[in-house]
Structures are given as structure tokens and as C-alpha cells.
Amino acid sequence: MEKYEREAKEAGRETWYLSWALDSTTQERAKGKTVEVGRAYFETAARRYTVLDAPGHKTYVPSMISGAAQADVAILVISARKGEFETGFEKGGQTREHIMLVKTAGVTKVVVVINKMDDPTVGWEEERFKEIKDKLTPFIKSAGFNTKTDVIWIPISAYTGVNVKDRATKAQVSWLTGPSLLETLDTIPLIDRKINGPVIMPISEKYKDLGTMVVGKLESGRVKKGDSLVMMPNKVNVEVLAIYSESEEEINYAFGGDNVRLRIKGIEDEDVSPGFVLASAARPVHSVKRFEAQLAILDHKNIICAGYSAVMHVHTLAEEVQLSALLHYFDKKTGRKSRKPPQFAKRGQKIIAQIEASDLVCIERFADYPQLGRFTLRDEGKTVAIGKVTRLLAIDENVITEGVSNIALGNTASSTAE
């Protein structure tokens, strides 16, 4: 941190030095904004953590979605400074969209960190903390989170370190009780991992370093050095040469839930793209161009008809897709789907549509594998719909019914994209 402090001071950005630990590019440090998903690793006495620092600015929401798709817990950092919270939460601000996107990505636990409580406009006032909590709670609830069991609220000052690692003392904050941020994270229940299932690892990054390196979160299964896997949708057989943890240490095994870097052979790095999936050769994930999905239309100024195009974000993939047909709509009162196809869809409606991608995409039915079956549609810088895959369609019009999760996988997370 001394190095970051010295470099930030030389660049005239002395007060930004803490952010330089994750904002590593010249562009990010010059603008004071996170652009790419920064990665860091740390340990407490109880657990090992991988931090995915996702951008907050609306221009970089696609990068934020990629980060959320790899997370188990979302830490929503809110500024308590007067005016900053209001700007982020008002219509057009990013706080609302980020809450909805992390839910769509399958994150089930949210820690809302109210930062900058030491700011002169706040002065660690309990009323400001309560005001922000009261305003955010209804919206977090409407996004699908249980605010009593799935959401935790922590006031902190990241700059001074108060209530981050150690609990705030009464001398620092007279009204605050309860655990610090790191203490809270250490007590969040761990997610059941599908370590006995087939290997599924969506690729978030790739680069060349004595071979082809791929980075991602192992969603299912286990990997060891020497394993033969298949890169989808290319269907290229590869071999695992080495496995590295987030601490850059070479390890012998990786299990479901681990964020890892793999050195593989059998494919060049230029033939791998974010959104590809490393899978078991015996049970590769599906790769299709056409599928059916249930969509909830969120925010679109015009009606949506067959032929509408948008960018689909699913796990670590961003791909242009087209709604080739609208098949059914759901009656708001009865919840039943229509027999006749709708002519159009508009904000607030739920529909079933047939979707066609411009290229092969690695997806699964939501019912079989939620992490590869939930997605968002974005257009003109806005999230216009959230959806879940209900059917995979082969080129010959047949419905693909068997997914990777039809073999024993253990527990599967159960959350909806509604």
C-alpha cells in the first residue's frame, strides 16, 4: 500500500491510493473509475476470499454483470455523503440497476456497506444510516431478496478503516453495535458446491503465458493436473497442464466454487473468448443458436416485437440475440400463459419468446442449471429484460431435453429470474 500511496501522490491523486489496489490500469487511475473487473485475494483466520471489484459507472455495466456472474455474495457499496447516495439511487442512477442485476446473476446474499460515514456531511450520524437503509430496503425487497434473511447492513469508513476489520469502538461510534464487515463475511453460510458433478467453468479471461491461460470460476466438478476436458462451443479437446489459485500459487486440485487460472494445451489463446465454457468431455454443456425463454420486460420505451435485437448477458458471455418469435404472454391476474402468440410485449409484461443468437452460445435450461440458464437483455445502455432459459432447440427443430444437471450434481441453487 505504501507503493500505491507514493504513486498516487506523484500523480496528484493522493486520496485515491486505496482504490489503486484494484484499479490497476492507467485509464482507471486517471479517471478515478473502475472500468474492468479487478481481482484481488485475501484471507482471514476463518476463510479465503476472492474480491471481484465491479465497475459502478453506467458505461461499464457489462463488466459489472460479468463480475456478478462469478460471485457468491454481493457487497453493495453505498456512499453516505449527502447528495452522492441520492444521485446513485434516483431514476437513471446505477444503484437500482445493480441490485436487480446481482439478483438476476444468481447472487442470494447481499451485504449493503454504507461507506463514507466519516464524511463531514454525515459525521457518523445514525439518522443518515437509517435514512439510506429505509430508502433502499423496499427496492431490494422488490428485486426478490428477503430483507430479513438475505440482506445485511454495515456502516463503515473505508478511508479510516473504522468497522472494516475491527469493530468500531464506542469512542468512535457511540450508537453502533454488532460485528465489523470482515466479521460479518466470515459468518455468512457457505454455498453447497456440486463438486461431484461434471466440470463447468465459464471463461472470464484468457491470455498467453507459457501456453494458453484461462481464468474463471469453477461452477461445478473438480479439476486436477492432467485432466482431459473440452472447450465449448468449439468442441476442442484440451489438457490441464497446471492449476493456479488466486494467490498465484500452483495447486494440485480445484473444486466447485474456486476461482482459478488454468494452463491448458490443445487450443491457442486466440481461439478462446470470454463466455466459452470448459467442460467434462463425457458431459459437455450444450451449445445452441436457438432457445426458448421466459422474459420479464423491465424498462423499454417502445413495444417489443418479433425481430427485436439486444445483447444477452449470460454467465461470462455477452452475445447479440434476436427475438425471432413471441410465443405466449402471461396474464397478470391468473398467471396463465396465453394460447395465442402476442403481437408485441411492453414494460411490465412477462412473455415466452423464441430467441436466436448470432453464433453458438453455451447455455442450459434454468431448471437444470440456473447459473447457465439465467440472463439479462440490454439495449442502448439499459437492462430491458431478465430471463430464464426454458427450452434448448436443436438445428433440426427438436427440443433438447437432457441437460448437464440430469446426472447427480448435489444441491442446485434455487432462485428465479423473475
Write out the residue ranges for each language-model feature.
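Conserved Switch II/interswitch segment of TRAFAC-class P-loop GTPases
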Residues: 47-50, 54-60, 69-130
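G-domain G4 guanine-recognition motif of GTPases
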Residues: 4, 79-81, 108-130, 152-171, ...
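Residue-level signature of catalytic and energy-coupling elements of molecular machines
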Residues: 1-4, 32, 53, 64, ...
